[in-house]
Amino acid sequence: NIGDRSFAGCENLTSVIIPNSVANIGYSVFDGCTSLAEITIPSSVTSIGGNAFVNTPWLAARQEENPLVIVNGILLDGTTCTDEEIVIPNDVTSICGFAFWENHMTSVVIPDSVTSIGSYAFSDCGNLKNITIPDSVTFFGESVFTNTAWVTYRYDENPLVIINHILVDVDRDQCSGKVTIPDGVTSIAGGAFAYCNQMTEISIPDSVNSIGSFAFNGCMTLKEIAIPEGVTSIDEATFYGCYSLTSISIPKSVTFIGEVVFCNCMNLSDVYYAGTPEQWNAIAITGGNSTDNYDNYFLVTAAIHFADGT
């Protein structure tokens, strides 16, 4: 694994050889490496984060060869593609974050070989009206379709935009008061409800087993929430800035709580945990249970209520 932004801004770096022990390259790893012209990427690499090679001569050269830059079945970049109608090749298995950010295309056809679409992949493609999304896609990153004509049209059909049982986006203007996610939804994508500032309550069905990062970030009027059993992690900044949040119910299936999940949740007073104190203490909470760490300070200082009434 090469972690996020590991070499970002290394302006004198000219060449990189990645060994075949590497499977994952994080986001913005080589961002701003303005002299990086040669990169050897082995076939072992199966995941590449958004903007991994942005602002490098290597990417610029690849874009000149083909505006759809594909490595190991991963579509890294299509921002320079000038076609109004884009058909992604059948050998692509995933689309990187920011891959088409701010592209002027009007339509895109995604083949059924694709299983995942990264964060902001089509964000700010204002002219994008038609998208063909196959059933094979089982993962959407954060804010994949933000500020596209396509998602605006979907709002007219339903303020909750659901694709392949994944809730990917919502119309902030229509989601007010209590919002109910329909049964059958299995995942809430990252950023799906971010800054939904008229929503005070939300009902999440038991069918949901994953909630993406930043999912409820900045929902300033959200007062309480119950996470269903089956969700195993609460990822980065999920409830960041939920100023009105006073209580949350957490199932015993949760084993991990990420960075700044409850940052600025200053009114969080009660946490209802479905397990035992021992199970609670076994949860990997970023920053630990220390009140000296601001990441999840408001979580660890709230009253924890356990299933046995203690």
Question: Model-found features: residue ranges?
Answer:
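Extracellular/surface-exposed low-complexity segments
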Residues: 287-310
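Consensus positions within tandem repeat domains that build extended binding/scaffold surfaces
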Residues: 3-6, 26-31, 49-52, 97-99, ...
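Structural signature of tandem-repeat unit edges
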Residues: 1, 10-24, 33-47, 56-72, ...
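A structural signal for leucine-rich repeat
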Residues: 263, 284-287
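Short low-complexity, flexible loop/linker segments enriched in glycine and/or proline
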Residues: 54, 146, 286-287
